[in-house]
Amino acid sequence: MVDEILKLKKEKGYIILAHNYQIPELQDIADFVGDSLQLARKAMELSEKKILFLGVDFMAELVKILNPDKKVIVPDRSATCPMANHLTPEIIREYREKFPDVPVVLYVNSTSECKALADVICTSANAVEVVKKLDSSVVIFGPDRNLGEYVAEKTGKKVITIPENGHCPVHQFNAESIDAVRKKYPDAKVIVHPESPKPVRDKADYVGSTGQMEKIPEKDPSRIFVIGTEIGMIHKLKKKFPDREFVPLEMAVCVNMKKNTLENTLHALQTESFEVILPKEVIEKAKKPILRMFELMG
């Protein structure tokens, strides 16, 4: 099946982009594997006109927004993000009315319709940097409450999180899990995602996006790392650092990320579906805050 996928990909002129949380078999056939920021940047550099995206819906839509003239397909239309769906355009409009002079910063894990109402987009890799660079001591931030709290800690700014309880179910680790792994692996370094709750972040050695997690073993000579994010990241790290050991903090599985399989990936290439289609108005409006993010990052 892998050979068939690679053959069809080449014949039909597709490039395959996969998120770090995809199953190992899909990461291994992808042309590029990365976090949402890395994938967004990669999508802008591509000369190929056809992209098969392996991730969840908001990520595929992000690729489409940045590449409106390219064909973007996904294997499973139902692969979505519960956290992104917590935030609605109505909530954003309500808070804009309450705080008319406060910039709206939206995490990339949001719907395209919500992005169209934002001032700037951020990812878990650059949220702190983006908010620091805004000329405002207060920001409206959504939809991840934990990432919003982390940004407030790191920037000293007031962060109004919307909706009230927006969070990623996959990253709701327990601080006790860190205590347990420290007993089992006393020399290990613990790295957690900023979507984790504060008690977990506070007990970790490092807090970072999946893209940042990849860089830590380059600088830290530790032999064992405990990883607090979706289980798919372990495969990526083991491939990159075969001489180190990577242990999951908990068995955190995103069922939506796992909806993509070798079978439906092959079917997507055979039928060239399902195509990501967005209204032109949404693409134009959502692109502005995304490009603003790139501007702020330099």
Curated annotation (Swiss-Prot):
<dbReference type="InterPro" id="IPR036094">
    <property type="entry name" value="NadA_sf"/>
</dbReference>
<feature type="binding site">
    <location>
        <begin position="107"/>
        <end position="109"/>
    </location>
    <ligand>
        <name>iminosuccinate</name>
    </ligand>
</feature>
<comment type="similarity">
    <text>Belongs to the quinolinate synthase family. Type 2 subfamily.</text>
</comment>
<keyword id="KW-0808">Transferase</keyword>
<keyword id="KW-0004">4Fe-4S</keyword>
<feature type="binding site">
    <location>
        <position position="36"/>
    </location>
    <ligand>
        <name>iminosuccinate</name>
    </ligand>
</feature>
<keyword id="KW-0479">Metal-binding</keyword>
<dbReference type="GO" id="GO:0008987">
    <property type="term" value="F:quinolinate synthetase A activity"/>
</dbReference>
<dbReference type="Pfam" id="PF02445">
    <property type="entry name" value="NadA"/>
</dbReference>
<dbReference type="GO" id="GO:0005829">
    <property type="term" value="C:cytosol"/>
</dbReference>
<feature type="binding site">
    <location>
        <position position="81"/>
    </location>
    <ligand>
        <name>[4Fe-4S] cluster</name>
    </ligand>
</feature>
<feature type="binding site">
    <location>
        <begin position="193"/>
        <end position="195"/>
    </location>
    <ligand>
        <name>iminosuccinate</name>
    </ligand>
</feature>
<feature type="binding site">
    <location>
        <position position="19"/>
    </location>
    <ligand>
        <name>iminosuccinate</name>
    </ligand>
</feature>
<feature type="binding site">
    <location>
        <position position="254"/>
    </location>
    <ligand>
        <name>[4Fe-4S] cluster</name>
    </ligand>
</feature>
<keyword id="KW-0411">Iron-sulfur</keyword>
<dbReference type="GO" id="GO:0034628">
    <property type="term" value="P:'de novo' NAD biosynthetic process from L-aspartate"/>
</dbReference>
<feature type="binding site">
    <location>
        <position position="168"/>
    </location>
    <ligand>
        <name>[4Fe-4S] cluster</name>
    </ligand>
</feature>
<dbReference type="GO" id="GO:0051539">
    <property type="term" value="F:4 iron, 4 sulfur cluster binding"/>
</dbReference>
<dbReference type="InterPro" id="IPR003473">
    <property type="entry name" value="NadA"/>
</dbReference>
<protein>
    <recommendedName>
        <fullName>Quinolinate synthase</fullName>
        <ecNumber>2.5.1.72</ecNumber>
    </recommendedName>
</protein>
<comment type="pathway">
    <text>Cofactor biosynthesis; NAD(+) biosynthesis; quinolinate from iminoaspartate: step 1/1.</text>
</comment>
<feature type="binding site">
    <location>
        <position position="124"/>
    </location>
    <ligand>
        <name>iminosuccinate</name>
    </ligand>
</feature>
<keyword id="KW-0963">Cytoplasm</keyword>
<comment type="function">
    <text>Catalyzes the condensation of iminoaspartate with dihydroxyacetone phosphate to form quinolinate.</text>
</comment>
<keyword id="KW-0662">Pyridine nucleotide biosynthesis</keyword>
<keyword id="KW-0408">Iron</keyword>
<dbReference type="GO" id="GO:0046872">
    <property type="term" value="F:metal ion binding"/>
</dbReference>
<dbReference type="InterPro" id="IPR023066">
    <property type="entry name" value="Quinolinate_synth_type2"/>
</dbReference>
<feature type="binding site">
    <location>
        <position position="210"/>
    </location>
    <ligand>
        <name>iminosuccinate</name>
    </ligand>
</feature>
